[in-house]
Amino acid sequence: MKKILPLVIIAPLLISCSSSKNKAENEAYIKDTNGFDILMGQFAHNIENLWGLNEVLIAGPKDYVKYTDQYETRSHINFDAGTITVETIAGDNPSAHLRQAIISTLLMGNDPGTIDLYSDADYIPISKEPFLYGQVLDNNGEPIRWEWHAAHFADYLLQTRLQTRTTGLRQIWSITIQLVPNHLDKRAHKYLGMVRKASQQYGVDQSLILAIMQTESSFNPYAVSHADALGLMQVVQHSAGRDVFKMKGKWGQPSRSYLFDPENNIDTGTAYLAMLQNSYLGGIVNPTSRRYAVITAYNGGAGSVLRVFSRDQNRAFQIINGMPPDQVYQTLSTQHPSAESRRYLYKVNNLQKNYRR
């Protein structure tokens, strides 16, 4: 009894500590979420007050949007469309405001942690290796690296491409710049080394990582979402981020700055794919069927994938393992309750085929 007694005494303490830990984590998550919602609400309100309701534009997974000049000027990179649009409502010398915004956007660096997309802070650090280098060419077909070069191109754009439009009582001055046709490939190339490293470390196919990165962010390291998913692989701190930290023996969850670092983001996103592949959905025997399930789960969660087949987890695995892969794909792409997850499987699966070629 003497050896058992301490365990009996300690067990309730362990349960209590675990319960307290979970409670603290839940409270921290609620606090973070509420804080983010308040921040976003105030941010959108500030924009609406100046630009009007129909002109509210906020950064997203495939849209870089940065406000400056007390919210009167903004730069928008649409990574899907391959365009940069710089706009201002500043009535006092709008060309000067546009010129500075064009220069700052063309020369901004690769570190998303240095730029606050949820404020009107004017500071945008200029990099020796701009993020957009090679993705934008000047009027002579040359890539832009230096400040004098960006300034000359900005002057050319202001002389030849300045446009105006009216919204409500506001006049908006704008410049639109096209990215090069293969801008997506140029961004993807920046991260191939990181993808190879994560692929080898976690045993996840490179083509799957790249397909998910393209689907989630179009290789935009500044990617954010309304759900506060962050970075290239759109990792959510309190779910996938927390799961990966726990798997690595780390306390808590990754910070925003941690996930905005491209290498950390790719590592965390790939580690989560490995957890889906080897743990949460490891009961699926056929690798192709498991891949379909992993893709869908990265978007909508492993639990929702299994519930498509049965509410009982073991039974769900049995049903999936009794199906050919094509039937698993058909079931997930037509019967998953989330239309977004159904589209996600279709898109990632097709993109992965391209990356395998």
Swiss-Prot record:
Coiled coil location: none
Known catalytic reactions: Exolytic cleavage of the (1->4)-beta-glycosidic linkage between N-acetylmuramic acid (MurNAc) and N-acetylglucosamine (GlcNAc) residues in peptidoglycan, from either the reducing or the non-reducing ends of the peptidoglycan chains, with concomitant formation of a 1,6-anhydrobond in the MurNAc residue
Keyword field: Cell outer membrane, Cell wall biogenesis/degradation, Lipoprotein, Lyase, Membrane, Palmitate, Signal
Gene Ontology process terms (BP): cell wall macromolecule catabolic process; cell wall organization; peptidoglycan metabolic process
Subcellular location: Cell outer membrane
Transmembrane listed as a keyword: no
One Gene Ontology cellular component: cell outer membrane
Broad class of enzyme this protein falls into: lyase
UniProt xrefs under InterPro entries: Lysozyme-like_dom_sf, Murein_transglycosylaseC, Murein_transglycosylaseC_N, Transglyc_AS, Transglycosylase_SLT_dom_1
Gene Ontology MF terms: hydrolase activity, acting on glycosyl bonds; peptidoglycan lytic transglycosylase activity
Lipid positions (N-palmitoyl cysteine): C17
Enzyme Commission code(s) on record: 4.2.2.n1
Signal peptide start and end residues: 1-16
Principal location class: membrane
Residues where lipid is bound covalently (S-diacylglycerol cysteine): C17
Domain of life, source organism: Bacteria
Record-linked Pfam families: Mltc_N, SLT
Topology versus the membrane: Lipid-anchor
Function: Murein-degrading enzyme. May play a role in recycling of muropeptides during cell elongation and/or cell division.
Record family assignment: Belongs to the transglycosylase Slt family.
UniProt-recorded name of the protein: Membrane-bound lytic murein transglycosylase C
